[in-house]
Amino acid sequence: MVNLTAAEKTQVTNLWGKVNVKELGGEALSRLLVVYPWTRRFFEHFGDLSTAEAVLHNAKVLAHGEKVLTSFGEGLKHLDNLKGTFADLSELHCDKLHVDPENFRLLGNVLVIVLARHFGKEFTPDVQAAYEKVVAGVANALAHKYH
């Protein structure tokens, strides 16, 4: 659960309504893999990830980034039950994929940067504060199975 005020919920959903999940999802996952190169080990089956340029243009990375942000957007519809919403993904990432749960926090941080880059002045400090709460809540929900 994320404790957001009514105003924060409105800010989050209003901005999210403008998000192009294909574009921003690809950028967010690509940035994660470039900035934190050790995360690439989870995506070795995606092909060439040897350079930043290769990552940024890898069709499988871009498609998976879209999938990630689509799931994130679904989570925004269930802010009062993030653990339930992400229970299956938490189990998958823990039991099958063995993803370090810290990576969820890192991806959340990258997503905030991508949103700020794309929305500029519209991504005010108040909007950022609301999104920081949301990405922390989603990361916590995804890490739930690990506890």
UniProtKB/Swiss-Prot annotation:
Q: Which InterPro entries match?
A: Globin, Globin-like_sf, Globin/Proto, Hemoglobin_b, Hemoglobin_oxygen_transport
Provide the alphabetized UniProt keywords. Heme, Iron, Metal-binding, Oxygen transport, Transport
Q: What PROSITE patterns does this protein map onto?
A: GLOBIN
Task: Tell me the GO BP annotations in alphabetical order.
Answer: hydrogen peroxide catabolic process
GO MF terms on file? haptoglobin binding; heme binding; hemoglobin alpha binding; metal ion binding; organic acid binding; oxygen binding; oxygen carrier activity; peroxidase activity
For heme b, which residues are the binding ones? 64, 93
Q: Which domain of life is it from?
A: Eukaryota
Domain Globin as annotated: residue spans? 3-147
Q: Where do the TM regions start and end?
A: none
Q: Does the keyword Heme apply?
A: yes
Enumerate the Pfam families for this protein.
Globin
Tissue localization of expression is: Red blood cells.
| One GO cellular component term | haptoglobin-hemoglobin complex
Per the record, the similarity remark reads: Belongs to the globin family.
Known partners and oligomeric status: Heterotetramer of two delta chains and two alpha chains.
Protein's UniProt name:
Hemoglobin subunit delta
> What organism is recorded for this protein?
Loxodonta africana (African elephant)
